[in-house]
Curated annotation (Swiss-Prot):
One of its GO terms (biological process) is peptide biosynthetic process. The gene is efp. It comes from the Bacteria. Pfam families: EFP, EFP_N, Elong-fact-P_C. Involved in peptide bond synthesis. Stimulates efficient translation and peptide-bond synthesis on native or reconstituted 70S ribosomes in vitro. Probably functions indirectly by altering the affinity of the ribosome for aminoacyl-tRNA, thus increasing their reactivity as acceptors for peptidyl transferase. One of its GO terms (molecular function) is translation elongation factor activity. HAMAP family: EF_P. Transmembrane segments: none annotated. InterPro entries: Elong-fact-P_C, NA-bd_OB-fold, Rib_uL2_dom2, Transl_elong_fac_P/YeiP, Transl_elong_KOW-like, Transl_elong_P/YeiP_cen, Transl_elong_P/YeiP_CS, Transl_elongation_fac_P. The lineage of its organism: Bacteria, Bacillati, Cyanobacteriota, Cyanophyceae, Gloeobacterales. The keyword Electron transport does not apply. Its main location: cytoplasm. This is Elongation factor P.
Amino acid sequence: MISSNDFRTGTTIELDGQVWRVIEFLHVKPGKGSAFVRTKLKNVMTGNVNERTFRAGETLPQAVVEKRDMQFVYPQGDNEYVFMDMESYEQEALTRETLGDGAKYLKEGMSVSILKWQERVIGVDLPNTVVLQVVETDPGVKGDTAQGGTKPAKVETGAEVMVPLFITIGEKIKIDTRDNSYLGREN
């Protein structure tokens, strides 16, 4: 059992016979009345997103999720990605729908954590940051940085990130996978 006060992003709960993952949460303490927790939940089976409010301190059954360390091996076709279990060396193919937005950051050899519930893959935890090479971006013109502007850049995995004007093709940049933001250059 887990209290609604202990909700964090990524927490999994069982509700109405299904598994839900907390995407967003907000503890609200109104001036009058009791505190409550406003959440945005994603159904791990169907992908549906639902907003729900719980009383502060309300207990719910927590879904026991197994975390397995796996390595991305290669993409298979347009919609599948093959991962290898680091302990048993078994390979498993996951679809783009299962990976969600994380698919655009996958680079061969990258280590990720696969989340399983009752032997079914329900999600993937990527590293918080990745270092990728810029393969396509507009050239920066000298004097463009007076206002600190940004421009779109495409990286080696196909993801598009907004970067400062001084970034050029071939540079390696650090990207935050949680919000798709540029963090800095890498050597």
